[in-house]
Amino acid sequence: LIGVVLTSGLASCSNDDSATSNDISEGDLLLQKVLASNVDNTINSTYKALADSTQMLYEQLATIRKASTTNGVTQNMVNDACTLFIGARANYERSEAFLMGAAADFSIDPHIDSWPLDLTALYNLLVKSPALVEALDGDDGATVANANLGQSLLGFHGIEFILFRDGIPRTASELNANGTDSYNKSGLDFSSCSGEYEMIYAYAVCGDLRNSVFRLETSWNENAPQVHIDIMNSMEWSYTLTSGNSYGYNMKNAGVAGSTYSSVKNAISAVLVGDG
């Protein structure tokens, strides 16, 4: 749709030679509407869905984490978490159509979607680094994960490894405190790793994932839920342009003084190439 409107908009602009430098051409007005629709109906709605789904996944992992301590993890708990993970992952893949703005400026994509997962590092964490795992189990576990784990252990793929095996949900008993991992490949034997430790890791990493997604959401939408904005402020994470404007406002006001886009067509171009 943007491509079609861009063609007609540019044609309209080229036929509007009488417009003065202080006027907005009819073509640019049309393109501004396209940009506003893209921000409101595509980018913001996608990030909202992603934020909601990662929050639900985080809450479900909290349930499993708590149940793990009493060896009470059920298969339904794990299956529900896997369903929520798939939904969150699908929302993220939809957002990859516009990895620009905040996603690029704050390096969020590599932070939450680096591949492959470093299984050797994960083994060393879960089997050989009990002090760090215990730090991940604190109230600020997501912050500890963000600061200490590195991109190869953060994001979707680390959580996926804990929840799934060979594309299907893990056996629930493996995620209990008295459970052990059945993974034993390529010289990495996770059987000495407790299910409780795995859930501590997954829950902390999911907290960091959720916070990173909240950063995407609040960066584009100045009307994002206040609780999400409060989390950004409490973590002292930047989530706006240096002007203080949201990325959505900045794009909607392309060509207007204060926007980083010098013209409407520059903003359209950024959308089409997914950059800027």
Regions found by a protein language model. Give the residues of each.
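Sec-dependent N-terminal signal peptides
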Residues: 1-5
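C-terminal motif of bacterial Sec signal peptides marking the signal peptidase cleavage site
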Residues: 8-12
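Mature extracytoplasmic or organellar-lumen-exposed domains after removal of signal/transit peptides
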Residues: 20-276
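Bacterial signal peptide processing site
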Residues: 14-17
